[in-house]
Amino acid sequence: MRAEARAAVGELLEAAGLSPGQVLVVGCSTSEVIGRRIGTAGSEAVAGAILEPLLEATQAAGVHLAVQCCEHLNRALVVERAAAERYDWERVTVVPVPRAGGALAARAMRRLPDAVVVEEIKADAGLDIGLTLIGMHLRRVAVPVRLKTAAIGHARVVAARTRPKLIGGARAVYEMQ
């Protein structure tokens, strides 16, 4: 799973073309990764195996990592305090734990430097491991990215990048001539 996570995040970062300072949101059901139904068998060991490659890749790219909590915490996100302050994200008071927040968010809370929890963000790209519904935290307009890495363990992987809206209708011009 570590190699699959490394491959998936690498493919997405390349396809999305994120610049330093942009944000990648990740949602992950470790239950789904081990072949169980979401929310039933979270694994801190699996969370660690997935989080480390995510951190390595995002830190190397200068991209902020946001880890989505589960439904019990309203899909709040674990981020570094510096990112929360830079983007003026509203902080909330909670400590994610495996049974309320999810194993990956709980691990991220302990592992990210100066971690805090925020209620919502608008990320530039997203990686959804196990169909955790990260779309609420993506900028508009989300564009699907089909990865070669279609699964991590047993969990399906869905990815997206974002682009600015195209506005103006039939007479609009979208590229500088």
Swiss-Prot record:
Per the UniProt record, one Pfam family is: DUF436
Q: Which InterPro entries match?
A: Antibiotic_NAT-like (IPR028345), DUF436 (IPR006340)
- The signal peptide here is none
Q: Which family does it belong to?
A: Belongs to the UPF0340 family.
Xref: NCBIfam families:
TIGR01440 family protein (TIGR01440)
| Full protein name | UPF0340 protein STH78
- Lineage of source species: Bacteria, Bacillati, Bacillota, Clostridia, Eubacteriales
